[in-house]
């Protein structure tokens, strides 16, 4: 008796399927607050990250990393990371009042879910229910012109975890607050996400490197 079915050993592996809620997943964005830049408070009010340097960024040993203003300090706490004008990047350490300096040679745009995972602008996403390193395709992101002029192909990679949201949500790393302000008008709050081994592209330009104090 003949059969058209392929032998089990030769069949292509089945792709892991996403939960059905990913057909209408929540899509948010996060960025690195930079000292001196415009940003916003937890309530959505516009602020500029400057002012009297009344707060001290310290490491877990009590050593001073930098003096900053109140707004900058609070944004660094809220986002868990921050960029100083002098090019130093800090990340929250053991608690909300201690910071560590990020090794920018290894992770120039910040840390992901682990110390050896670096974030990549407009590629990295945070998720609470997808595996780190997994790539997914976001339909509504495909073809979007990014603030730096490059066009996105819809492919993103899970490099981070989120502590403030639930499952079936992607938090998109857009690097800059100004990029967020532009993209929030283009990308909807709910998107269609498909599990796919897609190719992530680089969207970093010389202008982006200059903003990140990497030039």
Predicted regions and their residues:
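Solvent-exposed, well-ordered loop and adjacent helix/strand elements within mature globular domains
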Residues: 11-215
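Fungal secretory targeting signals
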Residues: 1-13
């Amino acid at each position: 008796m003949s059969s058209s079915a392929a032998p089990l050993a030769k069949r292509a592996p089945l792709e892991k399927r996403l939960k059905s809620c990913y057909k209408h997943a929540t899509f948010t964005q996060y960025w690195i607050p930079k000292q001196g830049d415009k940003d916003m408070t937890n309530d959505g009010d516009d602020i500029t990250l400057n002012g009297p340097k009344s707060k001290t960024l310290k490491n877990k040993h009590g050593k001073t990393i930098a003096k900053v203003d109140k707004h900058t300090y609070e944004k660094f706490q809220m986002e868990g990371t921050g960029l100083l004008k002098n090019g130093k990047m800090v990340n929250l350490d053991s608690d909300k009042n201690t910071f560590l300096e990020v090794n920018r040679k290894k992770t120039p745009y910040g840390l992901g879910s682990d110390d050896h995972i670096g974030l990549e602008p407009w590629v990295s996403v945070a998720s609470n229910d997808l595996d780190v390193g997994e790539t997914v395709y976001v339909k509504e992101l495909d073809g979007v012109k990014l603030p730096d002029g490059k066009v996105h192909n819809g492919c993103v990679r899970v490099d981070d975890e989120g502590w403030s949201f639930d499952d079936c949500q992607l938090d998109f790393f857009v690097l800059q607050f100004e990029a967020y302000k532009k993209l929030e008008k283009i990308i909807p709050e709910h998107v269609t996400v498909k599990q796919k081994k897609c190719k992530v592209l680089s969207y970093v330009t010389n202008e982006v490197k200059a903003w990140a104090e990497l030039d």
